[in-house]
Amino acid sequence: TKQITGAKSAVNVVYKCAQLTGNYNFEHHIDYSPDYIDTYVERLPFEYLDKKEFNVLYAGITNVPPIEDRKLFYGNFYEDTRNPDEVREVFRYGFSYVPWTNYDKKKIAQIYNEYNLLDTLFPVTRSCEWNEHVGGKDPGIEHCGNCWWCHERQWAFGRLK
């Protein structure tokens, strides 16, 4: 994860999922580096796999909203790099599972609603990727409300918390 707050949130989400399902039969690995770089994060799962430290990597990456909707978001980072209409592989490299990669956050919000998770799981999840370029005070484990990811969350769920 890029930020220590992401690692803290991941623990909260996994714990809440275990509580809600009654399933505690898993191992949860988190890797946090204050010197985060994309190449490190891309390489790390292969190192764990080589050491037989896990069998599968689950990632919660979602698709981006339609271009016309995300033009309203701060920064509009993905307009040139991600096409919301492109169908992406859900299972990659023989061990990486990205089940939500072809669904935008509005679809995820529908799933939360369908399974009555808006008042239980949603409050412990976090989308914020605040950094000094966004401005304002570091929100810690809360949401800044100003970054692209907070705008996406608000767009999909109609709220941040």
Show which residues each predicted segment covers.
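Nucleotide-activated chemistry modules centered on ATP-dependent adenylation/adenylyltransferase
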Residues: 1-161
